[in-house]
């Protein structure tokens, strides 16, 4: 029982050694996580290994991006093939309904586009193979190398922790008194063992990274060679078809779109007949314009001066009555006397139509009611008096022997309306009779 109650010194020493080993390893992990500066000589000794690790991370990232790019490329190929096929079918359908040279061109181009769309889909086969090989490469080769790298990182952390432990033990070492010599030897043995394990894994990582890069180049060379041959064959066939279509349509007559002559120049290879037709059309339009202008000038000369001066709409129709309806209130007080004077003047003058002539036939054109001012009323009244006096003098010279001269007619004619007598505006009827 006593042998089980007390641990042997060797067992106790091994437990302490394991605890110290864990302590220094944890300290190294903490230093690496916090980014503290490590011993520059130790870091320089692992420069080759760090370069290999950068190559590995580059291979890993590029393979993942290549898989995503191939997937997107396949989707774009399918979309563009569908669009190209639809365009070819549309041109073929329109060519069946068009029997001209344009229909032949559309038919040939439509068939070429449909054929190109089918050949473009052939690129999906080498792309699918490339995607599969890259995915397999990532799942197997890169994953295996990643496992080895993780093991190497743990061995390096343990080795650097052992170096820290040996550095701490060397500070307490005194070879003259043999103080801490035994402890330093045990730490030195631990450092040697961890270094051997780290060097072995370091060599494995460097070899696997080199092999990984070579295998990736070999894989891409085979896969991309198949894709390259398929792509070149596709473009050669497509270019040959398009060249044949261009040669077949080289002799077709070009179209001259006159509606777009301001946006682009007229084609220079027009025939002489087209140029003659354009010249004749321009001359014909010029002659028609001249004839139309001459007809308008002749019609304008045949019209009387008064009819040209007055607008037509103001002399006829219901518009004239509507515009001058406001004069009814001014003419209403003398309407009965105007009718009496008209009856008396008819046998004397012999021309009842003249007395009924509208005073609006003046020299100036009438406008809307909003522009009819009192000054215009005065001008119209003067014109009416002048017209009546000229007519009376002419009739008197011709019929002086048969017709008596009316003595009271001029006064009575003044009551036909205020338009014929400007002095009557603002006076009553009695004042006018006394005057």
Curated annotation (Swiss-Prot):
Q: Which GO terms describe its cellular component?
A: acrosomal vesicle; Golgi apparatus
Q: Which residues form the AH domain?
A: 44-247
Residue ranges spanning the membrane: these are: none
Which example biological process does GO assign this protein? spermatid development
Q: Which Gene3D superfamilies match?
A: Arfaptin homology (AH) domain/BAR domain
- Entry-linked Pfam families: Arfaptin, ICA69
**What superkingdom does the record give?**
Eukaryota
Question: Where do the record's region annotations for Disordered lie?
Answer: 391-435
SUPFAM superfamilies attached here?
Answer: BAR/IMD domain-like
GO MF terms, alphabetically ordered: protein domain specific binding
**Entry protein name:** Islet cell autoantigen 1-like protein
Q: Where is the organism placed in the taxonomic lineage, from the top?
A: Eukaryota, Metazoa, Chordata, Craniata, Vertebrata
The gene that this protein is the product of is: Ica1l
């Amino acid at each position: 029982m006593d042998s089980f109650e007390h641990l042997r010194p060797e067992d106790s020493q091994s437990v302490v050694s394991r605890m110290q080993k864990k302590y220094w390893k944890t300290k190294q992990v903490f230093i690496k996580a916090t980014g503290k500066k490590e011993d520059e000589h130790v870091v320089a000794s692992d420069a080759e290994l760090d370069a290999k690790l950068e190559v590995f991370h580059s291979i890993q990232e590029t393979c993942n991006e290549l898989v995503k790019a191939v997937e997107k490329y396949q989707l774009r190929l399918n979309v563009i093939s569908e669009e190209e096929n639809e365009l070819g079918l549309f041109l073929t359908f329109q060519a069946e309904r068009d029997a001209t040279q344009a229909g032949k061109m559309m038919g040939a181009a439509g068939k070429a586009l449909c054929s190109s769309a089918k050949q473009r889909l052939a690129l999906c086969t080498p792309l699918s193979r490339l995607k599969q090989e890259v995915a397999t490469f990532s799942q197997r080769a890169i994953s295996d190398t990643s496992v080895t790298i993780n093991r190497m990182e743990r061995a390096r952390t343990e080795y650097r922790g052992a170096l820290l432990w040996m550095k701490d033990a060397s500070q307490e070492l005194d070879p003259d008194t043999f103080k801490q010599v035994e402890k330093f030897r045990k730490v030195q043995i631990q450092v040697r063992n961890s270094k051997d394990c780290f060097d072995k894994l370091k060599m494995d990582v460097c070899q696997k990274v080199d092999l990984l890069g070579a295998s990736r180049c070999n894989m891409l060379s085979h896969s991309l060679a198949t894709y390259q041959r398929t792509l070149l064959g596709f473009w050669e066939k497509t270019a040959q078809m398009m060249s044949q279509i261009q040669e077949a349509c080289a002799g077709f007559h070009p179209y001259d779109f006159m509606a777009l002559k301001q946006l682009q120049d007229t084609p220079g290879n027009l025939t002489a007949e087209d140029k003659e037709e354009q010249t004749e059309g321009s001359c014909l339009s010029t002659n028609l314009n001249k004839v139309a202008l001459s007809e308008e000038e002749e019609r304008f000369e045949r019209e009387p001066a008064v009819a040209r001066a007055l607008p037509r709409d103001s002399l006829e129709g219901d518009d004239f009555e509507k515009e001058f309806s406001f004069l009814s209130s001014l003419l209403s007080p003398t309407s009965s006397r105007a009718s009496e004077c008209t009856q008396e003047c008819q046998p004397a003058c012999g021309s009842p139509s003249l007395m009924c002539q509208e005073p609006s036939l003046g020299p100036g054109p009438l406008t809307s009611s909003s522009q009819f001012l009192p000054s215009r009323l005065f001008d119209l009244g003067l014109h009416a008096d002048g017209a009546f006096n000229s007519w009376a003098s002419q009739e008197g010279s011709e019929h002086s022997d048969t017709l008596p001269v009316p003595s009271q007619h001029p006064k009575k004619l003044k009551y036909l309306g205020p338009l014929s007598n400007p002095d009557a505006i603002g006076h009553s009827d009695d004042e006018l009779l006394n005057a």
